């Protein structure tokens, strides 16, 4: 991303990052501060867990390497409880293992589950067709599912989405030093900084609560709802918040 930024020679940028946009982009801002004039983030964060107990690390690693089969239902159940107490790594590891083990990852279905209103029956039948390898023939496939499956001609192209969750630093890894440098940068950040979150996304709710400590200069906007992918489900509301922030 830094090479892309430098190659295009962008400047006077207002940055907004969500999900991986924040995990990657917030560090990019810290590495090129003179190119950015304002920063906003939502449903994302900069995970930094240097003091994670060794027993938690061991349990996560054992689980990832185990032969346990994680279903879409059990994975979703664990993620929905990630902000209910306990170490978040012990919940997030279900998402990591589910993605890594899913040779034909149901990217369209997972997106549909979070981005559009569908009956449980419709979702269940779509998942059944996906599991059997007949998703292209499913009468339950929505246009959104088709759109999010379109970039992948066959399951062999899905290795990127399958692997990316294991790169989220929920336990100490090779990114620890870079995360620490970014956090040191934001602790002294003086340019306008806005946090705008859904507030009903269990995965990132804990990250929202850390922003005042992470960026003392930050201003928090009231939650706008919409779940994890609120840039899709609350597009107009989020766009309005960001446009107002840019025009201030």
Question: Model regions: which residues?
Answer:
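Flexible "cap/lid" subdomain of the alpha/beta-hydrolase fold that forms the substrate-access gate
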Residues: 1-16, 20-218, 222
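Catalytic active-site module of serine/aspartate enzymes centered on a nucleophile-bearing elbow/loop
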Residues: 217-248
């Amino acid at each position: 991303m830094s090479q892309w930024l430098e190659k295009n020679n962008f400047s006077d940028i207002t940055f907004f990052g969500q999900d991986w946009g924040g995990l990657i982009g917030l560090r990019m801002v810290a590495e090129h501060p003179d190119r950015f004039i304002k920063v906003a983030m939502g449903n994302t964060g900069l995970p930094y867990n240097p003091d994670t107990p060794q027993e938690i690390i061991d349990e996560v690693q054992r689980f990832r390497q185990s032969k346990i089969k994680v279903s879409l239902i059990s994975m979703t159940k664990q993620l929905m409880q990630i902000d209910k107490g306990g170490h978040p790594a012990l919940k997030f590891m279900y998402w990591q293992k589910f993605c890594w083990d899913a040779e034909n990852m149901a990217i369209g279905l997972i997106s549909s589950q979070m981005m559009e209103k569908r009956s449980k029956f419709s979702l269940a039948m779509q998942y059944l067709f996906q599991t059997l390898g007949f998703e292209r023939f499913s009468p339950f496939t929505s246009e959104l599912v088709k759109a999010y499956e379109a970039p992948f001609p066959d399951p062999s192209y899905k290795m990127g989405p399958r692997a990316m969750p294991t790169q989220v630093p929920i336990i100490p890894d090779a990114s620890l030093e870079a995360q620490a440098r970014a956090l040191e940068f934001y602790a002294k950040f003086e340019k306008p900084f806005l946090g705008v979150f859904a507030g009903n996304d269990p995965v990132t709710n804990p990250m929202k609560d850390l922003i005042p400590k992470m960026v003392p200069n930050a201003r928090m906007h009231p939650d706008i709802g919409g779940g994890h992918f609120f840039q899709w489900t609350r597009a107009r509301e989020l766009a309005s918040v960001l446009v107002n922030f840019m025009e201030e």
